[in-house]
Amino acid sequence: MSWQAYVDDHLMCDIDGNRLTAAAILGQDGSVWSQSATFPAFKPEEIAAILKDLDQPGTLAPTGLFLGGTKYMVIQGEAGAVIRGKKGSGGITVKKTNQALIIGIYDEPLTPGQCNMIVERLGDYLIEQGL
């Protein structure tokens, strides 16, 4: 299965008629493995800051998580594994696997819990596959 199929079929899937606004699978070097057409252009330093927070949890809390120039307030996550952020009625979930970052961005009517489930389910599957 191609990385694009993982984005199209597993991340941008319908949940009760709703879907993520944007999604991507990135290498931990910041390279794009696959992304939805709606995924924002991002800066390398934004990915570096996400990776730093995954290595040293709490570093993004004071400044917020930035992706594509959009600032998300960092909320609860799982140290070293998941970062969750909120902006207005939407937000972001980032799941770290052995080799990749799975990123999902959502807005209402999709809920934070649905975004978390979509992103983390694929991340857990890839971890089980050694990826």
From Swiss-Prot:
Subcellular location as annotated: Cytoplasm, Cytoskeleton
Gene3D superfamilies reported in the protein's UniProt record: Dynein light chain 2a, cytoplasmic
Gene Ontology CC entries for this record: cell cortex; cytoskeleton
Chief site of localization: cytoplasm
One Pfam entry name: Profilin
InterPro entries per UniProt: PFN, PFN_euk, PFN_sf, Profilin_CS
Molecular-function GO terms, alphabetical: actin monomer binding
The keyword Membrane is annotated on this UniProt entry: no
Keywords: Actin-binding, Allergen, Cytoplasm, Cytoskeleton
The organism's place on the tree of life at top rank: Eukaryota
Family: Belongs to the profilin family.
Complexes and interactors: Occurs in many kinds of cells as a complex with monomeric actin in a 1:1 ratio.
Summary of the function given for this chain in its UniProt record: Binds to actin and affects the structure of the cytoskeleton. At high concentrations, profilin prevents the polymerization of actin, whereas it enhances it at low concentrations. By binding to PIP2, it inhibits the formation of IP3 and DG.
Protein name as it appears in the record: Profilin
Organism of origin: Prunus avium (Cherry)
